């Protein structure tokens, strides 16, 4: 005798293998039809954040992590925008080329997306911070957004799942971006000067 249940399926992605939506659908398929299933994929601010908000409905060509042009998807609904840093400044954009460059990688393209969202009328911008190739502390993004006074009347929020200190980011995330011990020390010093 089986009991009826309400089931909420709310996973994040399995990084590098399957999206949160695909995980949700796979779990739902395995659950008995006798139960009421609600699917609500989640994201941690990294890759997949844009998908959770309905996917991109805009495409912009911006600077990739090493300055090369990349097509980056983002979302604009009315006056609200969602930008996923990984779309413009993502580590996967460099890894596809089989090399990394943790010193020169920049968030400039993410700033270009933020600037574009502002120019298209966004007043509330959410930026998902995960999956970047850069340890520039957001300096590249700020340079692309100039003049910064244009942003004084809008709200920009960030989504991330870590509480790592600003300077400690180099030591924690530098290795996954290909940084050597010497490069990590350089990145920490650069972040310290920026702070």
Where are these regions (language model features)?
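N-terminal loops that bind phosphate or other acidic moieties
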Residues: 4-195
């Amino acid at each position: 005798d089986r009991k009826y249940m309400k089931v909420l399926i709310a996973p994040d992605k399995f990084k590098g293998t399957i999206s949160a939506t695909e995980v949700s659908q796979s779990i739902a398929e395995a659950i008995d039809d006798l139960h009421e299933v609600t699917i609500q994929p989640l994201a941690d601010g990294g890759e997949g954040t844009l998908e959770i908000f309905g996917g991109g409905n805009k495409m912009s060509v911006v600077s990739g992590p090493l300055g090369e042009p990349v097509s980056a998807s983002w979302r604009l609904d009315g006056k609200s925008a969602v930008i996923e840093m990984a779309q413009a400044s993502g580590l996967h954009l460099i890894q596809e080329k089989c090399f990394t460059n943790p010193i020169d990688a920049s968030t400039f393209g993410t700033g270009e997306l933020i600037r574009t969202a502002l120019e298209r009328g966004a007043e509330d911008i959410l930026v998902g911070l995960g999956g970047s190739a850069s340890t520039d502390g957001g300096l590249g993004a700020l340079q692309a957004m100039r003049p910064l006074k244009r942003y004084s009347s809008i709200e920009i929020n960030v989504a991330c799942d870590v509480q790592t200190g600003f300077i400690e980011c180099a030591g924690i995330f530098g290795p996954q971006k290909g940084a050597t011990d010497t490069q990590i020390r350089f990145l920490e010093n650069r972040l310290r000067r920026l702070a």
